[in-house]
């Protein structure tokens, strides 16, 4: 308001009292603080911030004893709770707070009225008493309200300094009471004059010889009363001394902090020390603007500057006496009429008081009767409702929770199930499920078993391992290794975002760069237990906590902050608080927060139990007298939070509003794990102060409530003291309800806080507080006894919690950490939303559903149908809005346009009832198809086209109006609607343009060749030229349903006779031509063609365009066009004139437009050219831009499979037309901007809570196997008693592996070396290797064990003689195993064996012999049980030999594959192959390397993958050797060609075993073998096992032999030894055994029972057992050659030949990728992207290394980025590999 407009007749007094208003001070300050956060109270906020800063500054300068009295504060509101009338700083706090309150109310009053400064010098005068006069001074120095915000802060500084100084001086006069009792320094005496009181005081002071400084004096006086001041004891003595005063009417005043108005006490130096030490940079040069009346004289202070004014005021406050009568007189004098115009008087004040009422009465009595005196209260505004708060800054915003999701115990996998659980009062307690750990072994209630849990109870979520890996672009292997907490964090984050309707990038607040994640997690069970059993590539990204949040950010492409927090049990709610802080700090605009806990590790159970956290009796018994600890629980929860104003702007549903959030620490607790009531109460106060909320207004608290004695007692105390204090007491209608979700679902630890928050949010939604079920017997006696009197208590039954009309409910959520952290959240109701009722006139609505798998899409459709069946009243408009604009869309899509809910239900049912529906679903392409705009030419326009769009879409309307204004300024009447810009607004990216005839101008404008204004100008002038130069109706145009050549042929006779002439105007399609010419001749042509049954149509146009009729306008048109600038097209232009695609400006000029006007529009040739140049294909989408889809029909005629979309259609609602087009684009793979489509009327739509996404889940769970968490406790105990044998094993050894334990003798000479070693088969590593191969339920040493020992010793001795050897290549030959070595089952026994070796470099060979030894004495047996020879050879010779055989072996493999395809051979899966093996031998998992087998009688091949783990220290791990070689054993013991019912086959050895290169962990190989009976022994079979890597033979087991043994001998030969002594060996039946003392002697060995066996230099496989002596008639002598024999490769007959299997490099690569990712090869389709398959950067590195190592293909990991799909990768491989 301008000053000139103010009421010049109003006389005003502003009175600043020295008393606080009678209102609740805390409430006044809270409301001030609340209003200061609203942008409407900007200056109030500035004033409070400046005042806070000044008080902080002043406190920092105090002496330490005083400084320590002031608690830390961030707002003056924090000081309100301090009892500032007590202590040394009472005067300072009271003075400064009164100044702040009065000036804050003053500023707020003006801002609330939104009025300008109206205090005019001369008309407005200020008055005040005592400290109030300092607040008045701030106004006196101001010329605007903004000035008051700054000068007021300085007044606060002076007030504080004055109070500190006065208190300091006064305590030197009389010390405070030691018991803290407050004594008054002033009394008021009534019905006595000042003079009489002075006389009495003079007598007292003189008579008692009081020092001058401590005398009692008069500090204030008026007609009716006198104030007497002095030290409290002296005042008391004065009243006792004087009979007059003793019997006078007197009262103590609330002045407890010292003396003011004492001229005998203070001097100018005192005043200077207060005023002149002020460090203000604002006030010194400021002038006094308004008169301020002295409280002593009643006249205005004479000061002209700020410094002088404060000096005068300071002098008066410290030394002057207050005379209220003078103040009244001064006020009357000001209010008396100064002129005839003055008609009204006003006193502004802060409520009223006894003094003010006296002044008011006196003024009224003195004023003339024609003066009207009014009062204005400057406090009343503070209680007004100003509507929704408009935050002044992000820091003052309220926050909105807009989405939530959960996985909680008791099957609560969604919010509805969670609420049902709560409403029914269910307890989810159960015992630990077997998939977590085995209670039979890990539970011991006595506590005697180390590392065992003493409680079997918990609360667990359902199916924790189930996860949709494909949806989140994770491979099965990565998913399995990823912590279920992290997986479910992803899932619940998606579901919460879905509920919130968040589409990243839809609005500014949901831009991916402004979204952050905050999750609490306090354990690492999966990483430490389950995944650690087999650490793999994804151990770190799958298990480390930081990756949980990081994976969410990475998947959704959020680039905001990602925090994983651990605050123990409060982690979940602390993460929410951190998210809130980030929102208030402006670091994010949307936050996803939650808590995570999935229990698997018994160690944590044990640790928590031993620390007495856990209940041994069951569930959390919150507030029960028998509470004995908490019960553990799983839990996953996520919430989505925004600032309230953003949520409202985004049209979100708001679940509840966060007013405040805070976390502190119980630093003063008696122990780190003990709760502390003081810290909890301080945190409550912080949250309440932050929000400006009265704790009495809180009506529901969700307790932390663990059910521990200490926790329940402390929390009940803190809650009741703050929220239900003894005084002020809650009214009967202010019941405070309490609840604790842990009594239902247990303590979710890191997820506990988020579970509590989710419950609170549901309480808001359901308006019901669920029953508390934690008290099983009676309430805990440690709970305060007076809770009911305080009107607070648990909701023991389901209790309605209705929202009061026009008000909001307040709730608090607590979560405390065992480490001492306390987190509290304060919530209120969401704003009541009034949905704008629009006129819903859209005829049809687009309903969209999508998924990432066919299964999920079908399930989503079923869910929607079920929802609609249950909610038939659903608004179709809201459903369309929700499914399109408020959903993230995926590659499997369903879309339709419907006009009713019933129609949609019918559509969904018809689709779901189609048995082929799922198979017909196709994902949209990874690359969206190109979109081409086709602009229609003349003849299609009609009245009202696009009118619905014009009416509804502001952008469309604005563009039309802009173009229309351009056209009018150019002198033309109308324009084509701005379709291109509108389609772009809807998110459609244009790839190219084409224009038909006149449409070329629009196409050129869209391509940026000419401007829109130039296009309008040229089209308009062209039309004018046509009208001016061409005769109307003299010519016509004829559309002919035939090609140009066909027309010419049919009209050949007429043309030859020259009876007719025509020109081709347009070649629209190959069968659609438009001709033009003179009207009569065109009519003749029409008749001639119709006579030949050719369809013809005369076009409704007045001219024959693109014919000679246009010649008169061409020169002028070209001249006009030359004035127009032509630019290079921004997108390709498909030219119907040139029948080509134009990419540059060379062909586009004025002449082009001339030719386009005259020459043929060859639309068909242009389309064909675009196809030839690759710009157009069958997937290209065409958008017809024009009033009616003419070009669309032409395109479909040329490309029948093309999608052509109209922008407008005659006689059809234009919004419906656009909707259809958008759905078509959506289903083709584009993602239209549904946001823009719904934006004009978004407020009319509501986001629906539809069923959540239906996941296509698979169980990725790694069970904890065994008892190793228990076993590790025994590592600290002593070892077993030593035997002589075990003692020798404990000595240091130069050679020690898993199988070779100790060197007992070693001799090394120039060319020979001898070595004796000893090993214990009962050693854990050795025993585990033996038990990997069991026969007859006994662990039997496979020959792969002897192979590894041989290679280990061989390489060791060879390097002793030839130390600089790079690689040692060994051929293990003449392996003979005479006796099976069966592991003893006697616990604690030793089972020694001795290996003796002798190497001779002259023969390049080494002989080996294995002996049993006595377990007690270590004495070696007389004869060996196995022998072998190692020959050190050149591997290149092997390579050459095998190269000649490789093609034959590969050929046989291909034949087997083909026969399997034809059903002539058996293809066995891994499970089936090893099931067949169980006829004889049962392999452990690590030995099961064969992935698949093709078996054809005695011939077989196998695909083999070695496990990546070595599981010990080996030369070549036995389980690898067996995996590549035991195919031979499967042939003999699993083929139909063998009599496996009566016999089993074991291998006594082989002629040779050698490997070209070492076997590699995780590598893939192929094995091939063909066994054949030996002619000399019908009970023996032999064959060669070839080992291939890729196309190359890399190893061979030569002449491996198998002997047939009757099954009835199984028990005889494969039973464990009963003692540790060596049994008497069976005498050899053939050859001789090696004597123990003659280790250089070699001898052949007898066959040994065991399925296939192989020996290996770097690797061996197969089942090598021991020789079984058979009955004499069955035995035959076998002589062995020193060189291995290779069995011949048998070439099949032609009839047996088959087509080779696909073993190309591409196929090998695909198989490798499938193996490494855990996917099926069939899933690796050409259009599958590596991102979708879960091939991330880490997997890329693994795959590139595997390609190199296994296939010899050098591929950089970056290739997976350069070739993002399988198809592109395979194309690269075929090209370059």
From Swiss-Prot:
Coiled coil, from the record: none
Residues bearing PTM O-(pantetheine 4'-phosphoryl)serine: 1737
Renumbered residue ranges of the record's region Product template (PT) domain: 1297-1616
Domain Carrier span(s) in chain numbering: 1700-1777
Region (Malonyl-CoA:ACP transacylase (MAT) domain), start-end ranges: 934-1212
Residues covered by region (N-terminal hotdog fold): 1301-1437
Sorted UniProt keywords: Acyltransferase, Multifunctional enzyme, Phosphopantetheine, Phosphoprotein, Transferase
EC class of the enzyme, as a word: transferase
Pfam families listed in its UniProt record: Acyl_transf_1, CurL-like_PKS_C, ketoacyl-synt, Ketoacyl-synt_C, PP-binding, SAT
Region of interest (C-terminal hotdog fold), ranges: 1465-1611
Ketosynthase family 3 (KS3) domain residues: 396-829
Biological-process GO terms, alphabetical: fatty acid biosynthetic process; secondary metabolite biosynthetic process
All residue ranges annotated as the PKS/mFAS DH domain in the record: 1301-1611
Gene3D superfamilies reported in the protein's UniProt record: 3.30.70.3290, 3.40.47.10, ACP-like (1.10.1200.10), Malonyl-Coenzyme A Acyl Carrier Protein, domain 2 (3.40.366.10), Polyketide synthase dehydratase (3.10.129.110)
Biased composition (Low complexity): 1677-1688
EC annotation from Swiss-Prot or TrEMBL: 2.3.1.-
Co-factor: note: Binds 1 phosphopantetheine covalently.
Cofactor requirement: pantetheine 4'-phosphate
Recorded metabolic or biological pathway in which this protein acts: Secondary metabolite biosynthesis
Annotated spans, Disordered: 1674-1704
GO MF term (any one): fatty acid synthase activity
Active site: 569, 704, 747, 1333, 1522
Role of this protein: Non-reducing polyketide synthase; part of the gene cluster that mediates the biosynthesis of neosartoricin B, a prenylated anthracenone that probably exhibits T-cell antiproliferative activity, suggestive of a physiological role as an immunosuppressive agent. The non-reducing polyketide synthase nscA probably synthesizes and cyclizes the decaketide backbone. The hydrolase nscB then mediates the product release through hydrolysis followed by spontaneous decarboxylation. The prenyltransferase nscD catalyzes the addition of the dimethylallyl group to the aromatic C5.
Entry remark concerning the domains of this protein: Multidomain protein; including a starter unit:ACP transacylase (SAT) that selects the starter unit; a ketosynthase (KS) that catalyzes repeated decarboxylative condensation to elongate the polyketide backbone; a malonyl-CoA:ACP transacylase (MAT) that selects and transfers the extender unit malonyl-CoA; a product template (PT) domain that controls the immediate cyclization regioselectivity of the reactive polyketide backbone; and an acyl-carrier protein (ACP) that serves as the tether of the growing and completed polyketide via its phosphopantetheinyl arm.
Protein name: Non-reducing polyketide synthase nscA
Origin species: Trichophyton equinum (strain ATCC MYA-4606 / CBS 127.97)
Species classification: Eukaryota, Fungi, Dikarya, Ascomycota, Pezizomycotina
């Amino acid at each position: 308001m301008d000053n000139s407009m103010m009421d010049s007749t109003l006389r005003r007094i502003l009175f600043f009292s020295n008393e606080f208003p009678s209102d609740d001070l805390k409430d006044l300050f809270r409301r001030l603080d609340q209003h200061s956060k609203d942008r409407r109270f900007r200056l109030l906020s500035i004033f409070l911030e400046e005042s806070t800063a000044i008080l902080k500054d002043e406190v920092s300068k105090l002496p330490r004893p005083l400084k320590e009295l002031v608690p830390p504060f961030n707002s003056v509101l924090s000081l309100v709770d301090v009892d500032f009338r007590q202590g040394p700083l009472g005067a300072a706090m009271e003075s400064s707070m009164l100044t702040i309150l009065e000036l804050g109310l003053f500023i707020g009053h003006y801002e609330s009225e939104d009025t300008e400064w109206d205090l005019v010098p001369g008309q407005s005068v200020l008055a005040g008493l005592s400290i109030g006069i300092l607040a008045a001074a701030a106004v006196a120095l101001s010329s605007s309200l903004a000035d008051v915000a700054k000068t007021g802060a300085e007044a606060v500084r002076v007030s504080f300094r004055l109070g500190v100084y006065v208190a300091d001086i006064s305590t030197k006069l009389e010390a405070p009471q030691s018991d803290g009792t407050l004594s008054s320094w002033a009394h008021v005496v009534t019905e006595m004059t000042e003079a009489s009181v002075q006389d009495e005081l003079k007598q007292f002071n003189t008579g008692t010889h009081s020092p001058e400084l401590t005398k009692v004096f008069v500090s204030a006086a008026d007609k009716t009363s006198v104030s007497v001041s002095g030290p409290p004891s002296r005042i008391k003595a004065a009243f006792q001394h004087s009979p007059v005063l003793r019997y006078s009417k007197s009262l103590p005043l609330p002045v407890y902090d010292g003396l003011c108005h004492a001229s005998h006490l203070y001097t100018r130096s005192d005043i200077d020390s207060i005023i002149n030490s002020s460090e203000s940079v604002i006030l010194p040069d400021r002038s006094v603007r308004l008169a301020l009346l002295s409280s002593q004289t009643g006249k205005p202070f004479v000061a002209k500057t700020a410094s002088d004014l404060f000096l005068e005021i300071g002098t008066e406050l410290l030394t002057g006496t207050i005379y209220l009568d003078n103040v009244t007189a001064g006020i009357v004098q000001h209010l008396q009429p100064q002129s005839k115009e003055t008609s009204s008087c006003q006193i502004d004040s802060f409520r009223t008081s006894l003094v003010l009422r006296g002044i008011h009465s006196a003024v009224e009595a003195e004023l003339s009767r024609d003066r009207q005196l009014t009062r204005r209260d400057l406090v009343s505004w503070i209680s007004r409702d100003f509507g929704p708060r408009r935050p002044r800054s992000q820091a003052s915003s309220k926050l909105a929770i807009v989405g939530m999701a959960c996985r909680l115990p008791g099957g609560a996998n969604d919010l509805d199930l969670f609420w049902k659980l709560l409403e029914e009062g269910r307890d989810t307690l159960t015992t630990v499920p077997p998939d977590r750990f085995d209670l039979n072994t890990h539970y011991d209630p006595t506590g005697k078993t180390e590392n065992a849990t003493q409680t079997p109870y918990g609360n667990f979520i359902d199916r924790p391992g189930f996860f949709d890996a494909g949806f989140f672009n994770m491979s099965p292997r990565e998913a399995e290794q990823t912590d279920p907490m992290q997986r479910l964090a992803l899932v619940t984050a998606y579901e919460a975002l879905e509920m919130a309707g968040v589409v990243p990038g839809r609005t500014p607040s949901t831009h991916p760069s402004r979204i952050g994640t905050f999750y609490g997690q306090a354990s690492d069970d999966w990483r430490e237990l389950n995944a650690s059993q087999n650490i793999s590539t994804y151990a770190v990204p799958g298990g480390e906590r930081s990756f949980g949040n990081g994976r969410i950010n990475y998947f959704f492409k959020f680039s905001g902050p990602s925090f994983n927090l651990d605050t123990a049990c409060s982690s979940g709610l602390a993460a929410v608080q951190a998210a809130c802080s980030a929102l208030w700090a402006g670091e994010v605009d949307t936050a996803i927060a939650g808590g995570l806990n999935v229990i698997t590790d018994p160690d944590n159970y044990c640790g928590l139990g031993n620390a007495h956290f856990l209940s041994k009796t069951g569930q959390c018994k919150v507030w029960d007298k028998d509470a004995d600890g908490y019960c553990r629980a799983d839990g996953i929860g996520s919430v989505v939070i925004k600032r309230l104003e953003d949520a409202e702007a985004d049209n979100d549903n708001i679940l509840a509003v966060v007013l405040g959030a805070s976390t502190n620490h119980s630093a003063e607790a008696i122990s780190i794990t003990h709760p502390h009531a003081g810290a909890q109460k301080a945190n409550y106060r912080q949250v309440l102060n932050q929000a400006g909320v009265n704790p009495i207004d809180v009506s529901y608290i969700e307790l932390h409530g663990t059910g521990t004695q200490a926790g329940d007692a402390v929390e009940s105390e803190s809650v009741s003291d703050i929220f239900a204090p003894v005084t002020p007491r809650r009214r009967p209608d202010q019941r405070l309800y309490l609840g604790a979700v842990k009594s239902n679902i247990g303590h979710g630890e890191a997820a506990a806080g988020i579970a509590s928050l989710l419950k609170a949010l549901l309480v808001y939604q359901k308006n019901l507080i669920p029953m508390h079920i934690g008290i099983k017997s009676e309430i805990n006696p440690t709970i305060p006894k007076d809770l009911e009197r305080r009107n607070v208590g648990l909701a023991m039954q389901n209790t309605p919690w209705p929202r009061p009309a026009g008000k909001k409910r307040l709730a608090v959520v607590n979560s405390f950490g065992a480490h001492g952290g306390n987190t509290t959240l304060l919530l209120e109701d969401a704003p009541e939303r009034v949905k704008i009722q629009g006129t819903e006139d859209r005829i049809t609505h687009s309903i969209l559903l999508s998924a990432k798998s066919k299964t999920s899409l079908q399930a989503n459709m079923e869910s929607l149908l079920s929802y609609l069946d249950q909610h038939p009243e659903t608004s179709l408009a809201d459903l369309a809005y929700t499914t399109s604009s408020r959903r993230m869309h995926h590659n499997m899509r369903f879309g339709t346009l419907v006009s009713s809910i019933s129609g949609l239900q019918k559509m969904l049912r018809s689709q779901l009832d189609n048995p082929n529906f799922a198979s017909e679903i196709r994902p949209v392409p990874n690359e969206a198809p190109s979109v081409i705009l086709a602009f229609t030419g003349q003849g299609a326009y009609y009245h009202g086209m696009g009118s619905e769009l014009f009416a509804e879409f502001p952008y469309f309307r604005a563009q039309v109006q802009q173009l229309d204004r351009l056209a009018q300024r150019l002198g033309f009447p109308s324009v084509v609607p701005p379709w291109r810009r509108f389609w772009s607004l809807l998110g459609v990216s244009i790839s190219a343009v084409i224009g038909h005839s006149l449409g070329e101008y629009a196409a050129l404008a869209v391509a940026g060749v000419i401007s829109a204004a130039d296009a309008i100008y040229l089209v308009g002038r062209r039309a004018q030229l046509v009208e001016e130069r061409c005769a109307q109706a003299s010519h016509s145009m004829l559309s002919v349903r035939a090609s140009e050549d066909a027309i010419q042929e049919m009209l050949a006779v007429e043309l030859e006779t020259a009876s007719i002439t025509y020109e081709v105007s347009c070649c629209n399609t190959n069968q659609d031509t438009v001709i033009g010419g003179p009207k009569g001749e065109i009519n003749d042509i029409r008749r001639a063609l119709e006579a030949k049954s050719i369809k013809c149509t005369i076009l409704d146009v007045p001219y024959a365009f693109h014919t000679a009729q246009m010649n008169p306008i061409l020169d002028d048109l070209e001249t006009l066009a030359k004035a127009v600038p032509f630019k290079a097209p921004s997108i390709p232009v498909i030219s119907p004139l040139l029948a080509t695609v134009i990419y540059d400006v060379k062909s586009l000029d004025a002449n082009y437009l001339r030719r386009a006007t005259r020459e043929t529009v060859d639309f068909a040739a242009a389309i064909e050219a675009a196809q030839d140049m690759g710009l157009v294909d069958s997937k290209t989408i065409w958008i017809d831009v024009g009033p009616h889809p003419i070009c669309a029909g032409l395109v479909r005629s040329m490309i029948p499979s093309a999608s052509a979309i109209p922008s407008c259609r005659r006689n059809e609602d234009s919004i419906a037309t656009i909707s259809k087009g958008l759905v078509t684009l959506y289903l083709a793979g584009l993602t239209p901007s549904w946001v823009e489509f719904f934006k004009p009327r978004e407020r009319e739509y509501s986001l629906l809570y539809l069923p959540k996404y239906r996941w296509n889940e698979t169980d990725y769970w790694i069970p904890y196997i065994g008892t190793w968490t228990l076993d590790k406790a025994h590592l600290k105990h002593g070892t077993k008693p030593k035997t002589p044998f075990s003692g020798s094993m404990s000595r240091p050894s130069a050679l020690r592996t898993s199988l070779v334990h100790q060197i007992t003798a070693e001799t090394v000479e120039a060319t020979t070396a001898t070595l004796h070693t000893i090993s214990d088969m009962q050693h854990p590593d050795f025993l585990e290797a033996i038990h990997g191969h069991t026969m007859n339920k006994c662990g039997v040493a496979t020959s792969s064990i002897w192979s590894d020992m041989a290679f280990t010793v061989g390489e060791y001795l060879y390097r002793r003689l030839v130390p600089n050897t790079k690689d040692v290549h060994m051929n293990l030959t003449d392996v003979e195993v005479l006796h099976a070595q069966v592991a003893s089952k006697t616990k604690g026994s030793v089972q020694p064996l001795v290996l003796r070796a002798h190497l001779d470099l002259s023969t390049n060979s080494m002989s080996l012999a294995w002996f049993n030894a006595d377990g007690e004495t270590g004495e070696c047996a007389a004869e060996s049980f196995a022998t072998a020879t190692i020959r050190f050879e050149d591997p290149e010779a092997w390579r050459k030999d095998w190269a000649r055989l490789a093609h034959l072996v590969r050929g046989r493999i291909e034949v087997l594959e083909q026969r399997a395809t034809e059903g002539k051979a058996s293809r066995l899966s891994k499970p089936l192959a090893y099931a067949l093996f169980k006829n004889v031998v049962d392999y452990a998992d690590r030995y099961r390397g064969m992935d698949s087998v093709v078996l054809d009688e005695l011939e077989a091949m196998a695909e083999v993958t070695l496990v990546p783990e070595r599981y010990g220290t080996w030369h070549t791990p036995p389980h690898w050797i067996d995996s590549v070689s035991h195919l031979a054993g499967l042939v003999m013991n699993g083929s139909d060609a063998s009599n496996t019912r009566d016999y089993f086959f074991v291998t006594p050895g082989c002629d040779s075993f050698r490997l070209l290169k070492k076997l590699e962990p995780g590598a893939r190989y192929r094995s091939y073998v063909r066994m054949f009976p030996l002619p000399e022994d019908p009970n023996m079979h032999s064959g060669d096992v070839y080992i291939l890597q890729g196309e190359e033979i890399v190893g061979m087991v030569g002449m491996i032999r198998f002997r047939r043994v009757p099954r009835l001998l199984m028990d005889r030969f494969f039973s464990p030894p009963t003692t540790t002594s060596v049994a008497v060996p069976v005498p050899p039946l053939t050859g001789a055994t090696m004597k123990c003392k003659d280790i250089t002697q070699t001898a052949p060995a007898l066959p040994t029972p065991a399925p296939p066996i192989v020996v290996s230099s770097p690797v061996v496989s197969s089942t090598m057992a021991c020789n079984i002596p058979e009955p004499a008639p069955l035995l035959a002598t076998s002589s062995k050659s020193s060189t291995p024999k290779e069995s011949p490769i048998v070439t099949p007959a032609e009839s047996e030949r088959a087509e080779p299997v696909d073993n190309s490099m591409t196929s090998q690569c695909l198989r490798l990728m499938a193996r490494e990712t855990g996917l099926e090869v069939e899933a690796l389709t050409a259009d599958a992207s590596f991102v979708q398959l879960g091939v991330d950067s880490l997997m890329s590195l693994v795959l590139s290394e595997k390609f190199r190592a296994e296939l010899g293909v050098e591929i950089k990991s970056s290739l997976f980025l350069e070739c993002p799909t399988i198809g592109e990768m395979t194309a690269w491989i075929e090209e370059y590999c």
